Structures are given as structure tokens and as C-alpha cells.
Amino acid sequence: MSKLISYAAKSPLRNIRLGATQIICQHASTDCMHMAASASASSSARKTYSTLAVDLTKQQMLLRKPLETLALQITKRSMFIQTQDTPNPDSLKFLPGVEVLGKGNTYDFPSATAAHCSPLAKLLFRVEGVRAVFFGSDFITISKEENGEWGLIKPEVFAVIMDFFASGLPILHEARPNADTEILEDDDETVMMIKELLDTRIRPTVQEDGGDIVFISYEKGVVKLKMQGSCSSCPSSIVTLKNGVQNMLQFYIPEVESVEQVFDEVDKVANSEFERFEKSLKQKDSANPPVSIGGTQN
């Protein structure tokens, strides 16, 4: 037995076994190191992916605002605004391609002081040379000052309209479009017929020219109307009123004897100032007549 033990101690098989055990232990240690390294790498990868996800989220947040700005710019660029001439050379009709006040609705802004109820009208009056603004169902009429140039006014009006419709703000605040032709309970039969004829036959035609006609009153055969938009200062407005509107009303409603144009206070002041300006120019010319020298005038 002791020999067997002694032999086993001396036997190379033990060394082999011991060597195998050492090798196994070494391999096991190596595997543990690999596993530890793998776990460390996995943890590092998770941290890297987590950091990357956070970075991507931050980048998305940072990019969101420029993308919204880009979308806004695309919206603005996608709007195609057309212009249309009117019988009045000082008025131009702008067609943004979207609804403005809706079918049959209009609103007149004869001056900047009347634009308190409309953010869009306020912005348009800031354009140099704009004298009056008028909103229709799907159009905007701009009336310029007499010495204004469309070449300078049009680009600014285009920019204002595009920016405003892209903003999504309401066109009117606490204001109703014209409802002058709305049938009221106390309207007599003649007034009802006048309003209906204005609303169905006359106003649509006038609105195509960038203006409108507002019913004021009817009394003793006289219909009083107010011209708006491009029609308010149009040189041919009187001809339109007499030859067009009056003739049509008299044809369908025999009770109508004549049609008269009504001017509000703003129109009266503007006309008064214009007449005074013309008078001062004439007086200046008469006070300083041209001097003739050698058959020529200076």
C-alpha cells in the first residue's frame, strides 16, 4: 500500500493530473477573465448606447425647432398670391388662394384708425403708401395713395399677407362683416326687394372688381348706398352707380326713383383735404407764373 502511495507520488500520471488540474484552473481563470471582460464590455456598451440615445434625443430636441421653422417657411412659400387690376388705377386686388372672410362677406377699412379690430389690416396699413384696405370673401383690396408706386408697395403687401396666413392668427377680432343686406323684421316690402337685388345681382359683380356696395337707407324713392374698396375712390364710381345700379333697381323695382352715393366722415375729410391741397397748388402757380426769356419759359 505504501508502495502504491509512494509510486503514485512519484508517478508521472499525478504530475499529468496535477498539470491537467492546473491547466483546467488556468483555463477556468482565463474564462473568468474573459467573462469579466465580456461583462465589462457589455456594461460599457450599454453605457455607450445609453449615452448615444440621450445624445440623439438632445439632437432631436435641438432639430425640432429648426424643422418647425422649415415647415413654416415651406408653408409660406407654398402660398401663391395673384393680383388683379380693378377699374380704379389706385386699387389692386390681391388673391391669396385661401378664404379671407368667407362667401359674400366683406369688411372695409377706409383708414388706419378703423383697423383696430383686424391684426392683418393693421399690418397692411404699416406698408408705406397704403391708403385703404378692404377684405372680401377670398380677396384683399389695397388702395394706395395717389403718389404711391405699386412697384414698391406690392412686394411688401405680398410679404405681409404670406406671413400673416402662416401665423394662423384670426383676421378679425370682435367684429362682424357687413350685414347691411340682411332682411330685418321692420323692413317693408320695397326695402326687402332692394336688399335682395343688391345681394344677388349687384354686389357679386362689384366684388369681382375688388369693392362692395353697402345699403344705407331707402326713403321717398331715393336709395342711398355707400361704395367701398376699389369703388370708393374710383373715377367711374358715379357712372357705375347711375348707369348700372340705378337702372337695374328701377327696372325691377318701379318705386325707386334715384340712387345716391353716401360718403362717411373719413371720405369727407379726405376729399376736403384733397380739394384744399389742389387749391393751394393753383394759388402757388398763379403767384409764381413762369418767366419768359427770349421766347422760352423757365
Curated annotation (Swiss-Prot):
Stretches for region NifU: 194-262
One GO molecular-function entry: iron ion binding
GO terms for cellular component: mitochondrion
Keyword annotations: Iron, Iron-sulfur, Metal-binding, Mitochondrion, Transit peptide
SUPFAM superfamilies (UniProt xref): Fe-S cluster assembly (FSCA) domain-like, Hypothetical protein SAV1430
Domain of life the protein comes from: Eukaryota
Localisation per UniProt entry: Mitochondrion
A single BP term in Gene Ontology: iron-sulfur cluster assembly
Binding site for [4Fe-4S] cluster: 231, 234
Entry function: Molecular scaffold for [Fe-S] cluster assembly of mitochondrial iron-sulfur proteins.
Family label: Belongs to the NifU family.
Protein known as: NFU1 iron-sulfur cluster scaffold homolog, mitochondrial
Source organism (scientific name): Drosophila grimshawi
